[in-house]
Amino acid sequence: MQVQEQVIAFLSANSKALRFLFLFGLIFGVCYFLIGLAPGVRLGIVQPLTAFLASAVTAIINLFGARAWTEGTIVRSSSYSINIAMGCDGIEASSLFLACVLAFPTSWRAKLTGLGIGIPLIQVINLARLVALYYAGVYLPSVVEGLHVYVAQTIVILLSTGLFIFWLERFATEYRRA
């Protein structure tokens, strides 16, 4: 009986944190399923967003004289080409942020503020990452794979986490749920 009492005491003492973790896992799981596995969402939302990102990357690097063009999700130039594939579109980082914000116990006003500012900002961060990876491919081709897999993805996740912490301190605590 002592173990059962300890489990009950643990669950009671940590009910808010456990609720957050459960909701976070559920929301992120649903997002990941819809993004990764549901073909309608993938074809109707994710692919057009990824093609838009490719066009935006092309427009930005052309501002610096790259003479690049877009073919679907591929950014091509005479110097280098990148394919913005699943996982490179910023949707996973946005989904993590969305799940954190929606799972946190605060007002809907604070949640909508966080999502309205946070998700577009994460996409801008990801866009900067893609532009930087293009130029890394042009000027540092021997290290671009390591930059892509380890450094750039880590930076996007860390900045997304920092954005969540900023939202917690600035907005979520200001509009607490009654």
Show the residue positions of the predicted features.
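Hydrophobic N-terminal alpha-helices or hydrophobic patches in metabolic proteins across all domains
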Residues: 1-178
